[in-house]
């Protein structure tokens, strides 16, 4: 092998390695992507079966029901529609009715959202941006 051929082989191997690393990175990021829905969006355009999504809105007044252990069910609403949610885990301290939440999980075949992560708003003025934008658009939330 000549010097030029060795150099081309090293450069080609390096580029192949970088392409493989980039492909694996994009594949891993694609697996972690979760699309954001409001309850009305989810009911009008259902997510694909077992697709991981984020659902945002307000916890509907009077909908929180605590079951055995850490099992809890509630409804996330956007003022027009609500989606029933079940969650088995410890809820954030700031979780309560009529407060903004973003939950992650999958839509079950029975129309109940099965959450594996619940995120509650941080303080009195915080609202997740996607939720606030949608509620403002629908005229259901005023920024203070």
Swiss-Prot record:
Transmembrane segments: 8-28
Cytoplasmic side: 1-7
Entry annotated with the keyword Cell membrane: yes
Record's subcellular location: Cell inner membrane
Membrane topology designation: Single-pass type II membrane protein
Listed GO MF terms: heme binding; metal ion binding
Gene Ontology annotations for the cellular component aspect, listed alphabetically: plasma membrane
Keywords: Cell inner membrane, Cell membrane, Cytochrome c-type biogenesis, Heme, Iron, Membrane, Metal-binding, Signal-anchor, Transmembrane, Transmembrane helix
Membrane topology (Periplasmic): 29-144
InterPro entries: CcmE, CcmE-like_sf, NA-bd_OB-fold
Sites where the protein binds heme: 122, 126
Cysteines joined through disulfide linkages: none
Pfam families documented for this protein: CcmE
A single BP term in Gene Ontology: cytochrome complex assembly
Membership in a protein family: Belongs to the CcmE/CycJ family.
Classification via HAMAP family: CcmE
Its job: Heme chaperone required for the biogenesis of c-type cytochromes. Transiently binds heme delivered by CcmC and transfers the heme to apo-cytochromes in a process facilitated by CcmF and CcmH.
Name recorded for this polypeptide: Cytochrome c-type biogenesis protein CcmE
Species for this entry: Chelativorans sp. (strain BNC1)
């Amino acid at each position: 092998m000549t010097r030029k051929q060795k150099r081309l082989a090293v450069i080609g191997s390096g580029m192949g390695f970088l392409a493989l690393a980039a492909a694996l990175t994009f594949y891993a990021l694609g697996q972690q992507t979760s699309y954001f829905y409001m309850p009305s969006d989810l009911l009008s355009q259902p997510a694909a079966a077992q697709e991981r999504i984020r659902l945002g809105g307000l916890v509907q007044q009077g909908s929180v029901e605590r079951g055995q252990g850490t099992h809890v069910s509630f409804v996330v609403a956007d003022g027009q529609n609500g989606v029933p949610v079940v969650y088995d885990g410890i809820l954030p301290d700031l979780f309560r009715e009529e407060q903004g939440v973003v939950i992650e999980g999958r839509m079950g075949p029975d129309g109940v959202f099965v959450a594996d992560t619940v995120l509650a708003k941080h303080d009195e003025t915080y609202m997740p941006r996607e939720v606030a934008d949608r509620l403002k658009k629908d005229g259901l939330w005023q920024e203070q």
